[in-house]
């Protein structure tokens, strides 16, 4: 690994944003984007010139491929991303609102590859090579095993 400035981890999902305002049930066209709080931070930091690593699990599916392609395009180290043949990459649907109100978001993430993140996914020393570990409450909230991983990472950075 090159020396990383920041390591973060979490769940990435494919996000489909309705092309027109209105209820999701009536939406006929969507634009595919990437979603995930921790990944958004990683992308922003990489665009600012920081060397960023991101840890996660994605499914061996089209959405997982989309996440990996996005990481490569954004220059984010994905050497600690596990491709899981058993569980899918999550996705979400998001309404489009032109009136400034909050959009409706429907998540399809239960049983996702990222919800199976655990200490077994961690490559020893990965965060020690970074200057900063970025954690939020989102990734630890998706499963008990992901929460254990968050505490393991934080302890390693002490």
Where do the language-model regions lie?
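Glycine-rich phosphate/adenosyl-contacting loop at the front of the ribokinase-like
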Residues: 1-77, 117-119
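Ribokinase/PfkB-type carbohydrate-kinase core domain
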Residues: 1-7, 70-72, 98-158
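Acidic, glycine-rich active-site loops and adjacent beta-strand->loop/helix elements
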Residues: 13, 57-63, 85-87, 97, ...
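Short phosphate-binding loop-to-helix
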Residues: 38, 85, 89-91, 115-117
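Short beta-strand scaffold segments in enzyme catalytic cores
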Residues: 43, 91-95
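A common structural microfeature
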Residues: 51-52, 90, 104
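A glycine-rich helix N-cap at a beta->alpha junction
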Residues: 68-87, 95-98
């Amino acid at each position: 690994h090159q020396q990383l400035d920041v390591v973060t981890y979490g769940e990435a999902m494919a996000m489909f944003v309705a092309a027109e305002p209105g209820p999701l049930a009536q939406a006929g066209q969507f634009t595919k984007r990437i979603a995930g709080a921790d990944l958004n931070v990683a992308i922003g930091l990489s665009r600012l010139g920081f060397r960023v690593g991101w840890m996660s699990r994605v499914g061996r599916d089209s959405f997982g491929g989309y996440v990996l392609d996005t990481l490569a395009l954004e220059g984010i180290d994905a050497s600690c991303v596990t491709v899981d043949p058993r569980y899918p990459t999550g996705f979400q649907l998001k309404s489009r609102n032109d009136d400034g109100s909050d959009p409706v978001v429907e998540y399809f993430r239960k049983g996702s590859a990222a919800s199976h993140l655990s200490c077994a996914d961690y490559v020893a020393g990965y965060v020690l090579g970074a200057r900063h570990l970025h954690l939020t409450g989102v990734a630890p909230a998706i499963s008990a095993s992901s929460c254990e991983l968050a505490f393991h990472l934080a302890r390693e950075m002490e």
